[in-house]
Amino acid sequence: MSITKDQILEAFAAMSVMEVVELIEAMEEKFGVSAAAAVVAGGAADAGAAAEEKTEFDVVLTSHGDNKVGVIKAIRGATGLGLKEAKAMAEAAPVAVKEAVSKEEAEALKKELEEAGAQVEIK
């Protein structure tokens, strides 16, 4: 005696929700499977959206170049640091000159430091 798919569907339709839950649990035990829904990987799309929405940038001095004195002056003007601190920052490259600034401020600082002879990245 063979049961068709239609007969199985009719039997499901006639069951209460609790009976269906019990049937699913029994099937999981019998066949060693889980009826849990698979998790869809959406992390890559979220990371792309986060990159587009970035509003804070870090200005990183990668090298003071040949004009160390000019770069130190530019750092002092941009950060308000003293001579000793600005010199230490220029010599510690790569180092973040300013962190969590707007894109416009980051671009302006990058331009100022590059004009002084430094190599700069915005992250």
Curated annotation (Swiss-Prot):
Keywords: Ribonucleoprotein, Ribosomal protein. CDD domains: Ribosomal_L7_L12 (cd00387). Pfam families: Ribosomal_L12, Ribosomal_L12_N. One of its GO terms (molecular function) is structural constituent of ribosome. GO terms for biological process: translation. Coiled coil: none annotated. The keyword Metal-binding does not apply. InterPro entries: Ribosomal_bL12, Ribosomal_bL12_C, Ribosomal_bL12_C/ClpS-like, Ribosomal_bL12_oligo, Ribosomal_bL12_oligo_N_sf. One of its GO terms (cellular component) is cytosolic large ribosomal subunit. Belongs to the bacterial ribosomal protein bL12 family. Homodimer. Part of the ribosomal stalk of the 50S ribosomal subunit. Forms a multimeric L10(L12)X complex, where L10 forms an elongated spine to which 2 to 4 L12 dimers bind in a sequential fashion. Binds GTP-bound translation factors. Forms part of the ribosomal stalk which helps the ribosome interact with GTP-bound translation factors. Is thus essential for accurate translation. This is Large ribosomal subunit protein bL12. It comes from Shewanella amazonensis (strain ATCC BAA-1098 / SB2B).
